[in-house]
Amino acid sequence: MLEHELIVTNKLGLHARATAKLVQTMSKFQSNTTLSTKGREVNAKSIMGVMLLAASQGTVIRVRIDGEDEHTAMQALSELFENRFNEDT
């Protein structure tokens, strides 16, 4: 199991489009992935769950990934956050 903290750095936070990219990315992996912040923990493969986090810019998200492809999944998720969901120029 891997755990890591990621910071939402894109201007609009985890809005619908960013959430869809996150869920689509994590759905490619077999590992179970949870995201937590502000006392809420959700399945990263659930668009409604991720939207419920209401994560704005600057929010720290704790990521927990468990499964055979956890390292690859964590790298993909980290890159998505680092690239600001390919939204900010």
UniProtKB/Swiss-Prot annotation:
Q: Which residues form the HPr domain?
A: 1-88
Q: What is the lineage of its organism?
A: Bacteria, Pseudomonadati, Pseudomonadota, Gammaproteobacteria, Lysobacterales
Native species: Xylella fastidiosa (strain 9a5c)
As for family, the record states: Belongs to the HPr family.
Coarse class of the protein's main subcellular location: cytoplasm
The signal peptide, as residue positions, is none
What the entry lists under PROSITE patterns is as follows: PTS_HPR_DOM, PTS_HPR_HIS, PTS_HPR_SER
Name of the protein: Phosphocarrier protein HPr
GO process terms (BP): phosphoenolpyruvate-dependent sugar phosphotransferase system
Query: InterPro entries per the record?
Result: HPr (IPR050399), HPr-like (IPR000032), HPr-like_sf (IPR035895), PTS_HPr_His_P_site (IPR001020), PTS_HPr_Ser_P_site (IPR002114)
Question: One Gene Ontology cellular component annotation?
Answer: cytoplasm
**NCBIfam families associated with the record:** PTS_HPr_family
Q: Which gene encodes it?
A: ptsH
- List, from the UniProt record, the residues annotated as the active site of this protein: 15 (pros-phosphohistidine intermediate)
Q: Where are the transmembrane segments?
A: none
